[in-house]
C-alpha cells in the first residue's frame, strides 16, 4: 500500500494507483476530458493537471502513479489557470456551433467550459472542416474534433481494427482514417463505438429522422415501425425517464403519438430468427461431415463486416439466417402487406435499433428480397429520442399501450437478443425442444450469461454434446477467430456481437460520457424475460400463425427466399 497526501488529506491506496483514482477515494474531483479507464490514458488534453510537491512541471493525474509520501495539490491557482488555458486552447480548435450540435447539452467539453466559467476564448480559432461522405452511416466533422484520441484508442484496443490514426504534430495534429483512406475503403465494422465514446459532436450517426417525418406525411405510405429488444432498456435515458416510466409499453405509446399507425416489436422477428437459425444449426450439426462448423450467428452486421474483411475464409460459417431487422422487413412487405391489401412498395418500414451498422445492413441490396430495401430507414435509439423531443411529446404523461398485432408479440427469449449471449441462449431453448420433444427449464442455459468478452460452455442435450462460445467486442472476436483458425479451439456454435456487452452497449444507444450502462440494460432485459409469460420462441402464437398461414415451416422454400441470405455476397 502507498500513503500520500492530496489537498491536505491522507490517502492510502494500492501501489500502481493513479493520482486520479486515489483522489476519487476521498471524494476529490479532478476534471478529465480525454480519459477512458484502461482504454485511453494518454493525457492528451492535460485537463487533469495537478501539482506534485518537488516536481516543477504539472502532472497528469490520469496516468501518473502515486508514490509513498507524495504530496498532491489539485486546486491551486496555478492548477486552475493551467486547466483553464488548456480548455481554452482546445476550444480554439473546436467550432462553436453548439446550438445546432447533436451533442448540445450532452457534451463533455461544453460542460467543462461551463464548470470553469470560460466566457470567451482568447486564442485565434483554427478549426477546419474536411470533406466527408455524408451518405455513410458514421459522419465525422473534423472542425469539432478535439484530438482527445478516444476514437483511436477504442477502435484499436476494444475493437482491434485500428481504423483511425493520428497524423501531423503540434497545432496541426489531426485524426483521420488510417492511411488517408475514405471510410468506405477502410475495414470499418461501422459498430459506432467511436461515436459513443466521442466526448463531443465530432463523430455521430447519419441522421435519417427527416425521411421518417416525410413518410408520415405521405398519404400513399403505410408507415410501419419495429423496435429492437435493446432499445426498450435504454430509450428513456436521454429523456430523463426513470426505469419504471421508460417501459416498452410506454415506448409503443410514444411512437404511436408521433402518428405511426403500425407499431411492432422486433422481438417477434427475433423469435422468427430463432426458429430458422436453430433449425439450420440442427441440420448442420447432424450433417457435420458436409457442413461448416462451428456455425456463427449472423444477426450483427458489425460482426459480419468484421468477419468478411478480417477472416474471409471463415465467412461460410455464418448462419444464412437474416437478422431480426431484415426478417421483419421481409415479412412486413410480404405477409403483412397482403393482410393490409397493400403493395410491398406502399409499406414504409422503419426500424429503431441500438446500432449504427444496421443502417449499412438495411442499405445492402443482398439483404433485401421483397423490394429494393425491405427496411427503408433505420433510426438509432438516439434518433428516436430526438424525434420525440422534436414533436414535443410529453412521454412521461402517456398511458402504456401494447404493440400492435400480428407482428408485435414476442417471447422472453426474443427480448434477450439485446444482451451478449442472448441469441445463443434463445437458440438453445428451442433447439433443445426440437431435439428432445420437450422444453428445458427456461434458465437451463444461463451459464453462458455474463460480461466477460469470451465465454465458453458445454451442454448436453440427450446424448448430444454441444461445445459453445459467446463473444462480445471485436477484440475478443479476433482472439477467438485466431484460435479457431489455428485449430486451438473447437466449437459447434458461436455467438458474436460486435459491441461489448452486445446490443445493450450498441453504438446507437444513449451516450453517458464516463459511465457505462450496458450491464444495467442487460439486467433489465433478463428481468423482462423472467417476467414474460412466453419464454420460448417456438411457443410464440404469432410465430405459429405465421408458419401455418404463410411460411409453412422453418427452412421451407419460402422461408429460404424471404428469411435467409448469403453474407459472402454482401456489398461492403
What function would you assign to each model-found segment?
Residues 9-15:
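A short N-terminal beta-strand-loop micro-motif at the entrance of redox/enzyme domains
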Residues 6-9, 53-54:
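Short strand-turn-strand beta-turns centered on an Asx-Gly dipeptide
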Residues 14, 136, 146, 189, ...:
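Residue-level recognition of alpha-helix initiation/capping sites
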Residues 1-4:
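Short structural boundary motif marking the start of a folded domain
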Residues 46-190, 196, 203-218, 222:
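Fe-S ferredoxin-like electron-transfer domains
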Residues 15-75, 79, 205-572:
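Iron-sulfur-associated redox domains of electron-transfer enzymes in respiratory
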Residues 11, 133, 143, 186, ...:
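Residues that cap or flank secondary-structure elements
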Amino acid at each position: 500500500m502507498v500513503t500520500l497526501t492530496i489537498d491536505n488529506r491522507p490517502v492510502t491506496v494500492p501501489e500502481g494507483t493513479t493520482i486520479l483514482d486515489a483522489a476519487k477515494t476521498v471524494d476529490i474531483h479532478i476534471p478529465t476530458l480525454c480519459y477512458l479507464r484502461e482504454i485511453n490514458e494518454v493525457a492528451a488534453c492535460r485537463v487533469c493537471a495537478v501539482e506534485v510537491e518537488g516536481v516543477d512541471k504539472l502532472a497528469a493525474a490520469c496516468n501518473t502513479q502515486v508514490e509513498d509520501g507524495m504530496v498532491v495539490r489539485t486546486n491551486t491557482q496555478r492548477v486552475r489557470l493551467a486547466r483553464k488555458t488548456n480548455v481554452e486552447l482546445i476550444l480554439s480548435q473546436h467550432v462553436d456551433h453548439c446550438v445546432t450540435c447533436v451533442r448540445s447539452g450532452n457534451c463533455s467539453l461544453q460542460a467543462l467550459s461551463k464548470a470553469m466559467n470560460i466566457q470567451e476564448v482568447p486564442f485565434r480559432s483554427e478549426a477546419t472542416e474536411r470533406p466527408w461522405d455524408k451518405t455513410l452511416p458514421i459522419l465525422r466533422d473534423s472542425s469539432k474534433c478535439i484530438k482527445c484520441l478516444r476514437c483511436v484508442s477504442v477502435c484499436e484496443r476494444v475493437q482491434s481494427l485500428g481504423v483511425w490514426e493520428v497524423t501531423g504534430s503540434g497545432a496541426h495534429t489531426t485524426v483521420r482514417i488510417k492511411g488517408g483512406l475514405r471510410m468506405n475503403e477502410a475495414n470499418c465494422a461501422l459498430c459506432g463505438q467511436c461515436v459513443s465514446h466521442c466526448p463531443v459532436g465530432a463523430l455521430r450517426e447519419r441522421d435519417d429522422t427527416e425521411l421518417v417525418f416525410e413518410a408520415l406525411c405521405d398519404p400513399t405510405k403505410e408507415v410501419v415501425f419495429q423496435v429492437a429488444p435493446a432499445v426498450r432498456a435504454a430509450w428513456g435515458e436521454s429523456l430523463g425517464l426513470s426505469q419504471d416510466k421508460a417501459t416498452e409499453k410506454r415506448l409503443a405509446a410514444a411512437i404511436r403519438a408521433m402518428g405511426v399507425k403500425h407499431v411492432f416489436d422486433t422481438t417477434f422477428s427475433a423469435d422468427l430468427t430463432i426458429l430458422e437459425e436453430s433449425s439450420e444449426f440442427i441440420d448442420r450439426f447432424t450433417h457435420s461431415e458436409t457442413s461448416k462448423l462451428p456455425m456463427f450467428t449472423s444477426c450483427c452486421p458489425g460482426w459480419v463486416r468484421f468477419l468478411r474483411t478480417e477472416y474471409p475464409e471463415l465467412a461460410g460459417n455464418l448462419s444464412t439466417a437474416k437478422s431480426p431487422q431484415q426478417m421483419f422487413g421481409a415479412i412486413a412487405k410480404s405477409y403483412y402487406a397482403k393482410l393490409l391489401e397493400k403493395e410491398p412498395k406502399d409499406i414504409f418500414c422503419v426500424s429503431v435499433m441500438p446500432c449504427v451498422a444496421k443502417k449499412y445492413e438495411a442499405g445492402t441490396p443482398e439483404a433485401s428480397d421483397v423490394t429494393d430495401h425491405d427496411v427503408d430507414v433505420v433510426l438509432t435509439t438516439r434518433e428516436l429520442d430526438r424525434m420525440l423531443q422534436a414533436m414535443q411529446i410529453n412521454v412521461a404523461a402517456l398511458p402504456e399501450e401494447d404493440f400492435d398485432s400480428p407482428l408485435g408479440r414476442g417471447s422472453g427469449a426474443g427480448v434477450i437478443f439485446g444482451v451478449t449471449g442472448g441469441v445463443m441462449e434463445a437458440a438453445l431453448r428451442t433447439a433443445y425442444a426440437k431435439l428432445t420433444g420437450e422444453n428445458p427449464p427456461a434458465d437451463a442455459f444461463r451459464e453462458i450469461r455474463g460480461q466477460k468478452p469470451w465465454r465458453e460452455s458445454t451442454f448436453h442435450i440427450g446424448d448430444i454434446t454441444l461445445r459453445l462460445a459467446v463473444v462480445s467486442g471485436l477484440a475478443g472476436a479476433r482472439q477467438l477467430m485466431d484460435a479457431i483458425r489455428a485449430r486451438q479451439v473447437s466449437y459447434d456454435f458461436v455467438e458474436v456481437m460486435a459491441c461489448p456487452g452486445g446490443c445493450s452497449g450498441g453504438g446507437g444507444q444513449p451516450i453517458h460520457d464516463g459511465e457505462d450502462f450496458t450491464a444495467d440494460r442487460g439486467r433489465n432485459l433478463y428481468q423482462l424475460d423472467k417476467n414474460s409469460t412466453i419464454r420460448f420462441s417456438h411457443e410464440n402464437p404469432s410465430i405459429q400463425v405465421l408458419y401455418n398461414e404463410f411460411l409453412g415451416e422453418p427452412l421451407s422454400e419460402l422461408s429460404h427466399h424471404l428469411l435467409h441470405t448469403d453474407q459472402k455476397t454482401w456489398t461492403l
